[in-house]
């Protein structure tokens, strides 16, 4: 029951977070800091008028920003498949791009429970 409530809550949060975010062609996520504690990062990715896809990434204590970015890229590729182009850039940065002809999309941080980790989103 607890997992069901958490899933419903995250879905509601993601729809609110996505609604407040602009849609763009490309997004850049910049990770800063290290994982002072274990936790998780949940991102919501949604195309125009599409339901958000949630990607939850478990993060182990002690990982640096480059290792965290790698884990996020792996989870995004797993969850999104070939819907978007996902690349790790400069170690700690992640680019998510739409494919030619596909609609613009939004990205939002739904949850970050990792102490010491900052996540900034930039539209491009």
PLM feature spans:
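Short, linear, compositionally biased motifs with a strong N-terminal bias
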Residues: 10-11
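N-terminal signal peptide c-region/cleavage motif recognized by signal peptidases
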Residues: 14-17
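Polar, low-complexity export/assembly segments characteristic of proteins
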Residues: 20-124
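Positively charged n-region of N-terminal signal peptides that target proteins for export
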Residues: 1-4
